[in-house]
Amino acid sequence: MEDRYGREIRSFRLSITPKCNLKCFYCHKEGRNEEHGKLMSADEIGKIVKSSLEFGVRKIKISGGEPLLRTDLPEIIENIKDEQIKDISLTTNGILLEKYAQKLKDAGLDRVNVSLDTLNPEQYKKITVGGNIESVKKGIEKAIEVGLTPLKVNFLAMDCTVNQLPAIMDYCRKIGAILQIIEFIPMEPELKHHHIDVVPIEEEIAKSADQVFTRKFMQNRKKYLIDGLEVEFVRPMDNTEFCEHCTRIRLTYDGYLKPCLLRDDNLVDVVNPVRNGEDTRKYFIKCIEEREPFCKAQ
């Protein structure tokens, strides 16, 4: 199904918990800054995802908080697995990944994205307020070992991390991971000074790239191949291209459909209709009708 701007719905991002085992100072909490409501059950998540297939969803991304804190995560994955779904991936900080990688693979997870903003142990501990970078590295190694690939490393480009980019690139090249460089969205005014423009970084990468590809169904993102390393950029801020080609809807941890990453004022309750035994199609239709580009071309 297309929205009124002609954008197909192909991807569904599920936040399954607001809780996290780290306290990264920059976290935007998937656009939900306050904890409220109760978590959806594995069964409810499964029913909501199965309903989304009618509207064209073919890719699922599981996120949090930290999704590995849900002890029923393998059950959630099993419940959403369907032959119509081409890809189920998960975004994690990697702290618990070594322990659970095999169980997730066995449940039907295809691949993982792991957040890693620095390779400096002390800086990592400072950014995450106590995180152990060695646990993350071991988790990445285990994920690759069990076949949760292609593994992506999510690098958040900020004023305090950008000097780590060359080392992160070398690390990803060495382990065979894809590097995703993400623009920082400051959700609070006091964090604005950490934002940097990633356009010049992308321009430099483009100059050195051996090949450049365009991902049509991922906001027309460019993918750069440079010395054997795949690099992608995610630039949601003031980016008309990002919004114009968006194919994703979202589900909050407490069961609301979220038409736009950057808005929190047009959510559509879907979990209570599920709990009441209602047909959820009209709620998906309402969500899709609410979609409009946050950043529009002038």
UniProtKB/Swiss-Prot annotation:
Its EC number is 4.1.99.22. [4Fe-4S] cluster 2 binds at C243, C246, C260. Keywords: 4Fe-4S, GTP-binding, Iron, Iron-sulfur, Lyase, Metal-binding, Molybdenum cofactor biosynthesis, Nucleotide-binding, S-adenosyl-L-methionine. S-adenosyl-L-methionine binds at Y26, G65, S115. InterPro entries: Aldolase_TIM (IPR013785), Elp3/MiaA/NifB-like_rSAM (IPR006638), MoaA_arc (IPR013485), MoaA_twitch (IPR010505), MoCo_biosynth_MoaA/MoaC (IPR050105), rSAM (IPR007197). It catalyses: GTP + AH2 + S-adenosyl-L-methionine = (8S)-3',8-cyclo-7,8-dihydroguanosine 5'-triphosphate + 5'-deoxyadenosine + L-methionine + A + H(+). Pathway: Cofactor biosynthesis; molybdopterin biosynthesis. GO terms for molecular function: 4 iron, 4 sulfur cluster binding; cyclic pyranopterin monophosphate synthase activity; GTP 3',8'-cyclase activity; GTP binding; metal ion binding; S-adenosyl-L-methionine binding. SUPFAM superfamilies: Radical SAM enzymes (SSF102114). [4Fe-4S] cluster 1 binds at C20, C24, C27. Belongs to the radical SAM superfamily. MoaA family. This is Probable GTP 3',8-cyclase. It comes from Methanococcus maripaludis (strain C5 / ATCC BAA-1333).
